[in-house]
Amino acid sequence: MRIIVVGAGKVGTALCRSLVEEKHDVILIEEKEEVLKRLSKRYDVMGFAGNGANFKILEQAEVSNCDVFIAMTDKDEVNMISAVLAKQMGAKETNCSRT
């Protein structure tokens, strides 16, 4: 499955690791470039630096082609907006969770 995760906190990072271990195609969107670079090197994930509620970032991550979109930043508004945008852009399943 093609899965997009927004947010690379403790839970987001653990989720990415588990999804990669299960052989999913994982795309990570994270605001902090240094965190994104570290995780992209450690795990087999494609990364996009930026705000998950930004339409252009979601377009770059090809949200319209994802099977599952999971927003799990520490900001409720980013989680809600990004999940709604992802659904409108064609994501098959969306989920938002506060970490």
What are these regions (language model features)?
Residues 1-99:
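Cytosolic regulatory regions of ion transport systems
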